[in-house]
């Protein structure tokens, strides 16, 4: 099964069709837009301070202005581009592919002087691999508390970086094995700086593991799908690795979804429904006594912070987003999600 993942990353560029590449280009635009917009977020500033303090060879660009070693650039850019939680989502993968993979691809592409086309192709094939790892782990992995953006996503970052570094299939196997002992990220971080940090960890792990494998660093023979490998260790009861066919018989990345609101994707159906409803149009929040919503129960463990304390937590609050939507706030504006709005008395009364 790991061989199938490796084969995806090694596919000749001439065999990659235009449609998935077009979606990869759209996601490059989406990712860079989110990254540039996120550069003034406190977590982005702090990570650039970390990067400046560590120094190192200026081989890769950081969003916000500086050049640092590739692994650090991937860390900072991954977290920065996820800071606003406005980036794309792939629901079969159960995570955000662009923020965890593109920063790794960009950092290595700069170092290798690769073309934009080579970087985009590496991203796409890395994403296809990450989607299949995510599908194999299944939704139970996410429901158990793991953030697939950072777990399954790290393998996609490793594949993308490894392709750009020119790793052969054996080196790619070792890179995935190293990633298996590095990949991490928890959903308990949602609503904090730790969530975007997960995306940065994914990208940085990809750069590190692919680079080490290129230097001859070895790992267990099959750290991804093998006995006591990453997937098996994360399955309930540590069972045998099963799941969907992993071959690249069709491209899954075009199922990627793009956000229209600057908050958790799980809140978007509610926002869209309330915006389309005329039942409460023009009614002051204080005059609304109650109303009911139905949603998939899985989202209650993701974006149901009852009393958000920060702008980041507002992005994961049914209560706050319902009130904001009903009173006509522009939830597409990322500048709206501040610590000030988390403390608004009107929204607090509505949430009760």
Annotate each predicted stretch with a short phrase.
Residues 107-111, 164, 273-276, 328:
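Active-site catalytic microenvironments for nucleophilic, acid-base chemistry
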Residues 1-94, 191-204, 211-352:
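Terminal-appendage/accessory-domain detector
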Residues 77-135:
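Hydrophobic alpha-helical hairpins/lids featuring a short glycine-rich hinge
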Residues 81, 100-102, 107, 129, ...:
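Short connector loops/turns at beta-strand edges and beta->alpha or beta->beta junctions
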Residues 110-113, 117-208, 215, 220-227:
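Glycine-rich, mobile lid/loop segments that gate access to catalytic sites or pores
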Residues 93-98, 146-151, 260:
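Short helix-coil transition sites and intra-membrane helix breaks within transmembrane domains
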Residues 24-28, 100, 118, 122, ...:
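Residue-level detector of well-ordered alpha-helical segments, enriched
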Residues 27, 99-107, 128, 152, ...:
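Short amphipathic alpha-helical face segments that pack within enzyme cores
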């Amino acid at each position: 099964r790991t061989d199938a993942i490796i084969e995806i990353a090694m596919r000749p560029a001439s065999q990659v069709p235009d449609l998935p590449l077009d979606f990869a280009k759209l996601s490059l635009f989406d990712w860079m837009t989110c990254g540039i917009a996120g550069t003034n977020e406190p977590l982005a500033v702090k990570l650039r301070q970390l990067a400046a303090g560590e120094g190192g060879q200026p081989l890769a660009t950081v969003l916000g202005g500086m050049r640092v070693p590739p692994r650090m650039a991937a860390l900072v850019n991954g977290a920065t581009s996820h800071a606003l939680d406005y980036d794309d989502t792939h629901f079969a993968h159960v995570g955000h592919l662009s923020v965890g993979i593109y920063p790794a691809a960009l950092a290595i592409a700069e170092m290798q002087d690769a073309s934009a086309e080579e970087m985009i192709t590496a991203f796409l094939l890395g994403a296809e691999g990450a989607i299949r790892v995510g599908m194999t782990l299944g939704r139970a992995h996410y429901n158990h508390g793991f953030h697939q953006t950072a777990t399954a996503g790290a393998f996609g970052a490793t594949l993308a970086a490894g392709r750009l570094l020119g790793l052969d299939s054996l080196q790619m196997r070792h890179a995935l094995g190293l990633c298996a002992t590095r990949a991490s990220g928890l959903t308990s971080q949602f609503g904090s700086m730790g969530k975007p940090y997960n995306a940065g960890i994914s990208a940085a792990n990809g750069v590190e593991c692919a680079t080490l494998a290129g230097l001859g660093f070895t790992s267990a023979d099959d750290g991804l799908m093998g006995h006591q490998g990453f997937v098996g260790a994360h399955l309930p009861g540590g069972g045998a690795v099963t799941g969907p066919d992993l071959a690249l018989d069709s491209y899954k990345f075009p199922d990627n979804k793009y956000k229209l609101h600057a908050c958790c994707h799980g809140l978007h159906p509610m926002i869209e429904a309330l915006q389309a409803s005329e039942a409460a149009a023009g009614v002051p929040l204080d005059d609304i006594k109650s109303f009911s919503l139905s949603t998939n129960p899985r989202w209650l463990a993701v974006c149901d912070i009852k009393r958000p304390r920060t702008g980041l937590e507002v992005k994961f609050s049914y209560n706050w987003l319902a009130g904001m939507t009903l009173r006509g706030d522009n939830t597409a504006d990322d500048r709206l999600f501040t610590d000030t709005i988390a403390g608004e008395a009107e929204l607090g009364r509505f949430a009760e």
